[in-house]
Amino acid sequence: MSAPDILKDFKGSLTIEQDGSISSASGILQESFYNNKEFASTIISMLHDVNKITSSNNQEFKRMTVSFSEQTFIVTAIGTKIYVVVQ
């Protein structure tokens, strides 16, 4: 299954590099957050906090979900890239 097939059910997607730059965006995330370093650094900061918690409990971090009344952000870190999708 290709990335476009996987992402078709989401309202938008974003790829953040390790340095905080946004390398790609689509859908509502492109409209709202593309080139927004503050959004990217907030996501990275949240991941650092989660990593501290999971490391202290010997748990492996896989995915973080942040839910609001109108939308849900799903954040996944794989290698040096951070993928964000919104439902």
Curated annotation (Swiss-Prot):
Keywords: Lysosome. Regulator of the TOR pathway, a signaling cascade that promotes cell growth in response to growth factors, energy levels, and amino acids. As part of the Ragulator complex, may activate the TOR signaling cascade in response to amino acids. One of its GO terms (cellular component) is lysosome. GO terms for biological process: cellular response to amino acid stimulus; positive regulation of TOR signaling; protein localization to lysosome; regulation of cell size. The lineage of its organism: Eukaryota, Amoebozoa, Evosea, Eumycetozoa, Dictyostelia. Signal peptide: none annotated. Belongs to the LAMTOR4 family. PANTHER family: RAGULATOR COMPLEX PROTEIN LAMTOR4 (PTHR33967:SF1). This is Ragulator complex protein LAMTOR4 homolog.
